[in-house]
Amino acid sequence: MNNIQVAIIEDEKPAARLLEGMIKKLRPQWDIIKIPGSIESSVAWFASHPHPDIVFLDIQLSDGNSFLFIEQACPTSLIIFTTAYDEYAVRAFTVNSIDYLLKPIRQERLEEAIQKFEHVTSKYNQKLLEQNDLLEVL
């Protein structure tokens, strides 16, 4: 999968750099965007830019809980949560989330989450192609 746009929303710069490095190691062809790790900045960014394909989202941001960001920004992106807190896992799957990574993130778990994203998007793209084929027949 090429031309995948990835956003990292993380308020701790060392954690953001570490996650970026891990993603680049696994998928060097992906474009990574680091968005400031606050709800306010993230909502503003999403209001003025095309939404990326996937967002790695920390749950506790500098100005609150990332579920508020989701309510305000309504991202169309698939979300992989990255957090040190396991108590939000159930709620995470009520939004556009496909995985939940506990910090410290292990490379193997990140690879599993990325593969899940790739599987979901390939199935979605396959369905779109099938629908387009049906429309052409009509």
Q: Across the structure, where does each feature detected by a protein language model lie?
A:
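Acidic, metal-coordinating helix/loop segments flanking the phosphotransfer/catalytic sites
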Residues: E20, I35-I54
